[in-house]
């Protein structure tokens, strides 16, 4: 099955991938803007999960045409992913924390809570390679949400156990995003690549 990057590339789009350090929300926004500054045309900014908070903060960049939230947090001013998630907790097990303040999904719960619609071997590899998220990033608050000024598109993953699907629906309704809903786990970008690519292409029009 083709992934979303392969589909977009085949359809003539150029794809750049940000590798945020996940040390703080400000650091991750800065890393994203660094990549955006290298673009030479209108850009669709896509974020999954915590990445939604990043694109909310980085989306004021002049290159950004629209935003796509893929089972992602979409904070308003003063909100963090911690405050949003705490208000409507997901069905999955609580995150674990390292001694130095980085959060991760218990590998034993990863398949069920993050990627239930993927093969076990693939989910287990993802569990072993997950990038830990600092508490500082999880508690960083939005200051000037880009979705208030630019068109936004969003995917609700109806079987999500990492973000409450009802929270996804309420955030996207609040922002008046163009929404699709897929019967998927939190790893919707992997289990439904064609649908995700189609929404990104729609956002690029």
Language model features by range: what are they?
Residues 46-51, 55:
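Gly/Ala-rich beta-loop-alpha elbow adjacent to hydrolase catalytic centers
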Residues 28, 132-194, 198:
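Conserved serine/cysteine hydrolase catalytic core
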Residues 60-107, 134-141, 163:
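Flexible "cap/lid" loop of the alpha/beta hydrolase fold
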Residues 20-22, 72, 184:
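Active-site loop/turn elements of alpha/beta-hydrolase fold enzymes
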Residues 38-41, 148, 203-205:
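Glycine-rich phosphate-binding loop signature in dinucleotide/nucleotide-binding domains
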Residues 102-146:
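Conserved alpha/beta-hydrolase catalytic His-Asp/Glu region
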Residues 1-41:
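Active-site catalytic motif of lipid deacylating hydrolases and related acyltransferases
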